[in-house]
């Protein structure tokens, strides 16, 4: 059933289109109210229905659909405060933490926060961040790792406290302002100010360093961990990528090919990387042994411009602004083609419990069935 729920007022609202009419059914305190409004066409009625849902979301309602089919949203929560490039979120056990950009200061304090949701979409807590701009958020070893304006912090949910890694590890700020966080197998590797650390079982260890080249004055930096967290793929130069031992920093191989500047990489397996070209947003595969760049048959032309992509359990989702494509990596077959709601230009996407989780620049956090 698709309905809007307000946990604060205990109101439930269902909006639907019947022929050329918008039908609204509201339930609150045991009372039911129904209204019906006619429109000139079914198209106009559908537009009014979408507008009604959006207005309700902004008023604190949560959209839930227990019968959502593939490519459809089973959850919409209005978070607000979307900021292009900083749309981070991550899941922690049965909860989801979503970054919200406050966009203003209260005295000397920034109003940027982490919104803690349960799996029903109910907002349980809003946590003030020690710094603004959460560019990235990941989960490992029962902790959140946050890239706050290129400084890494660890948030311990059980203790409800932030750890400032810059001070803990006595890291000195440098001209290497680009940073990263990547996780796999409950291990995190992160980099800031030219230093690379691993975070495993609650312990932090430095194991390598990096120096970024630039392209059009923008630092080149992206990284990924292999499935077992034994290898780190690191790109800091145009047409060049290193594979490091993620425990001791040993360079296992250096790959050089005409793939340009990369801004996102992912280990498909121990021998293949899925890579995305900076600005072009084109997806390719890179063979780690031969350093050959290939376009696999499942990389269709219609989703070569990947503004976002994510992979889990043999499934690839490619997003081009508001269009989404789900692909079975084993067969190469398309599983679903769908449109994302509430996207202006960009979003961040991850898999959470088999569903596609999306944080959009228009202010929503959503779950889609895949």
Question: Model regions: which residues?
Answer:
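Short aromatic-glycine-(Arg/Gly/Cys) micro-motifs in beta-strand/loop hairpins
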Residues: 9-35
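WD40 beta-propeller blade core
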Residues: 115, 153, 197-198, 242, ...
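Hydrophobic beta-strand positions that form the internal "hydrophobic ladder"
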Residues: 96, 144, 187-188, 232, ...
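Short loop/turn segments that connect beta-strands within beta-propeller blades
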Residues: 118-121, 156-160, 200-203, 245-249, ...
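Beta-strand-rich domains and repeat architectures in extracellular enzymes and scaffolds
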Residues: 78-112, 132-133
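A short beta-strand motif characteristic of beta-propeller blades
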Residues: 72-82, 122-128, 161-173, 204-215, ...
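Repeated scaffold domains used in trafficking and secretory/extracellular systems
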Residues: 83-90, 130-142, 171-184, 215-225, ...
């Amino acid at each position: 059933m698709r309905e809007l729920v307000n946990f604060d007022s205990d109101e439930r609202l269902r909006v639907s289109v019947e022929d050329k009419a918008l039908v609204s059914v509201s339930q609150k305190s045991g009372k039911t109210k129904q209204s019906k409004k006619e429109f000139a066409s079914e198209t106009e009625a559908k537009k009014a229905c979408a507008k009604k849902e959006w207005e309700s979301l902004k008023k604190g309602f949560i959209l839930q659909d227990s019968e959502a089919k593939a490519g459809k949203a089973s959850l919409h929560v209005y978070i607000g405060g979307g900021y292009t490039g900083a749309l981070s979120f991550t899941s922690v056990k049965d909860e989801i933490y979503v970054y919200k950009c406050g966009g203003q200061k209260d005295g000397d304090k920034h109003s940027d926060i982490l919104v803690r949701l349960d799996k029903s979409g109910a907002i349980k807590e809003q946590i003030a961040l020690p710094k603004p701009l959460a560019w990235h958020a990941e989960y490992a070893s029962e902790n959140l790792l946050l890239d706050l304006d290129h400084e890494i912090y660890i948030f311990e949910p059980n203790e409800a406290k932030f750890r400032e890694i810059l001070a803990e590890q006595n890291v000195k700020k440098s001209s290497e302002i680009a940073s990263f966080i990547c996780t796999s197998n409950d291990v995190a590797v992160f980099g800031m100010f030219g230093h690379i650390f691993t975070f495993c079982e609650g312990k932090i260890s430095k194991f390598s360093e990096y120096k970024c080249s630039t392209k059009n004055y923008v630092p080149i930096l992206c990284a990924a961990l292999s499935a077992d967290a034994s290898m780190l793929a690191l790109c800091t130069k145009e047409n060049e990528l290193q594979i490091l031992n993620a425990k001791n920093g040993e360079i296992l191989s250096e790959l050089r090919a005409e793939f340009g500047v990369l801004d996102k990489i992912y280990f498909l397996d121990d021998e293949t990387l899925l890579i995305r070209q900076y600005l072009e947003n084109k997806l390719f595969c890179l063979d780690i042994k031969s350093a050959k760049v290939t376009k696999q048959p499942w990389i269709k032309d219609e989703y070569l411009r990947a503004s976002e992509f994510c992979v889990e359990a043999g499934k690839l989702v490619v997003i081009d602004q508001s269009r989404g494509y789900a692909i079975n990596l084993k067969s190469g077959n398309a599983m679903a083609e769908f449109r994302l709601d509430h996207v202006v230009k960009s979003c961040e996407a991850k898999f959470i419990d088999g569903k596609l989780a999306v944080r959009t620049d228009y202010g929503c956090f959503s779950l889609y069935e895949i």
